[in-house]
């Protein structure tokens, strides 16, 4: 919900529904739960009793597929309203016994924010554990344009000029492009601005990395 805070509503809905449908196509016995964290720009809406926009769009998907969700804002707001919590603190300051939830307005602190999230999630999981085990049958899509068929394709499968060099997985540059997910199967390198890759596709969205 935080990372999608300003994302287009349909992109959010298409992405979330695509994830759900991909998971249940692969294994209908997989249980899914949506988790909604929060950051400082959401506070005005939350204090007014409204879910933030990204949460509202994700909830349309959760409701349609009967997926449980956990909103971490509730316990945070309760402490904030009781003046027991500082949402964005300064690590160099003391706050007379109050819980410092974040130091940057987004990421919960280890000593203050994480225990609140842990309490919220633990309570919610105990509640969800009462539900009956069952397979999840896929029904007609809520959004026909969802990203259920989205996939990653190695760049080597596209037409490209001969100047590109396929990097070894032992190459440091290869590792630098992987990130935490280790998602890229191949990485090509070129120092010639005339080298090219041609991508032809049929669909509504394409990304090249």
Where in this protein do the model-derived segments appear?
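Glycan-recognition and processing domains
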Residues: 130-200
